[in-house]
């Protein structure tokens, strides 16, 4: 209420001070750092990504892009402090980078889908390349955006780029030129893709898309990559014997790790993978408990009723095996 979110430049100084406290306190224990989570959601989910309540009006882009610039400056200051205070540490940025395919080979579909992708990659372009991309000038002119910058901002951003790129990947979408752009926490909600299966909540399941994104990003930035979020939100059933046979979740995990192995074979530098998430929580995308991601079941329903008792799903032991083998043993358990 007092500062209004990241469109207020004062937050840059607050963030720098906060980072320095963390670097000093944990410099002997932590060598990998990440500045912002899914920072590119500032343009589609500003409250979640940038702490801003933004009215859906003509002034929204001005506030959102101003917030983005302030976050770029804050990120660069964090990178600078991290490298000075913790020699050898790596500090990265994190984006939501589920991608979109053109619905057809119609040139308008292809061009508009490309521009939609630029909208997401704008953030990593600045934070990893150290400069504003040329395509943003036209976008700002069309939107009437005039970002306020201070002397030295460009130099600071150019001299303090991130060491690695982390990103979340859940699905792909399909875009038709002229369609209204809608988004959720997983990415762009587009047209139907008849070649892909979908989750109960309509999210396309596309492991090949993960391989595609890894190659796209590594070609663009040549920086190490970390898949910080990947997972399947679905309903779970407790069988009469007390087991939760979440086969669909295990199949999703297996196919996406296989896609990562293919990306590594393609030459991509991928140093980490984490699943969203280990335990059932309320879904950020829909506000439901029923939409479960975890390997651990929590007894709670959409109305908040339940004992909160926890129990392992079949996927718990499966992922434990996958971790122990560093992804080499992906054989699914036999059905009984």
State what each model feature region is.
Residues 1-336:
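Active-site region of glycoside hydrolase catalytic domains
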């Amino acid at each position: 209420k007092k500062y209004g979110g990241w469109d207020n430049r004062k937050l840059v100084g607050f963030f720098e001070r906060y980072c320095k406290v963390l670097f000093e306190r944990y410099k002997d224990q932590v060598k990998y750092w990440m500045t912002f989570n899914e920072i590119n959601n500032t343009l589609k989910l500003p409250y979640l990504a940038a702490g801003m309540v933004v009215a859906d009006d003509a002034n929204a882009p001005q506030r959102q892009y101003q917030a983005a610039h302030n976050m770029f400056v804050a990120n660069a200051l964090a990178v600078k402090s991290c490298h000075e205070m913790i020699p050898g540490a790596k500090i990265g940025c994190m984006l939501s980078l589920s991608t979109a395919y053109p619905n057809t080979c119609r040139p308008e579909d292809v061009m508009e889908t490309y521009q939609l992708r630029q909208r997401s990659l704008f953030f990593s372009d600045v934070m990893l390349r150290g400069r504003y991309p040329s395509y943003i000038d036209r976008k700002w002119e069309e939107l009437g955006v005039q970002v306020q910058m201070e002397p030295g901002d460009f130099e600071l951003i150019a001299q303090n780029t991130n060491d690695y790129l982390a990103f979340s990947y859940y699905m792909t979408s399909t875009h038709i030129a002229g369609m209204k752009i809608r988004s959720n926490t997983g990415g762009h909600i587009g047209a139907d893709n008849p070649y892909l299966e979908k989750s109960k909540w309509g999210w396309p399941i596309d492991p090949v898309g993960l391989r595609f994104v890894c190659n796209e990003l590594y070609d663009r930035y040549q920086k190490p990559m970390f898949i910080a979020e990947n997972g399947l939100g679905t309903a779970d059933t407790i069988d009469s014997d007390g087991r939760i046979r979440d086969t669909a979740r295990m199949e999703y995990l297996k196919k996406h790790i296989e896609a990562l192995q293919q990306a590594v074979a393609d030459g991509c530098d991928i140093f980490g993978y984490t699943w969203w998430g280990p335990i059932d929580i309320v879904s950020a995308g829909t506000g439901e408990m029923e939409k479960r991601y975890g390997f651990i079941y929590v007894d709670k329903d959409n109305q908040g009723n339940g004992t909160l008792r926890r129990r392992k799903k079949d996927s718990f032991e499966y992922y434990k095996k996958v971790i122990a083998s560093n992804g080499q043993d992906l054989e699914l358990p036999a059905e009984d």
